[in-house]
Amino acid sequence: MELTPREKDKLLIFTAALLAERRKARGLKLNHPEAVALISAAIMEGARDGKTVAELMSAGRTLLSRADVMEGIAEMIPDIQVEATFPDGSKLVTVHQPIV
């Protein structure tokens, strides 16, 4: 199976997000890479589902709270930018202050 670098990146994000979901479900606080992966994967999947950029920007702020992440992680992530594939092409989605 031949994958492009972008496809490899998407799979890596998805794998990290899956791990983050499992850890969160067990009650563990997420670290920086896990939090970013979880939010990024949700944005990418939402784009594939046909949601708008505005919907994803809003939804991206509801996925994690400060209680879900290790101390100081919320301050380390002022925004997250994801290039997501929508039905009408790729678009950049920016979520400001994703962890409230």
Curated annotation (Swiss-Prot):
It is found in: Cytoplasm. Its EC number is 3.5.1.5. Coiled coil: none annotated. The keyword Phosphoprotein does not apply. It catalyses: urea + 2 H2O + H(+) = hydrogencarbonate + 2 NH4(+). InterPro entries: Urease_gamma, Urease_gamma/gamma-beta_su, Urease_gamma_sf, Urease_subunit. Its main location: cytoplasm. The keyword ATP-binding does not apply. GO terms for cellular component: cytoplasm. Keywords: Cytoplasm, Hydrolase. One of its GO terms (molecular function) is urease activity. Pathway: Nitrogen metabolism; urea degradation; CO(2) and NH(3) from urea (urease route): step 1/1. Belongs to the urease gamma subunit family. Heterotrimer of UreA (gamma), UreB (beta) and UreC (alpha) subunits. Three heterotrimers associate to form the active enzyme. PANTHER family: UREASE. This is Urease subunit gamma.
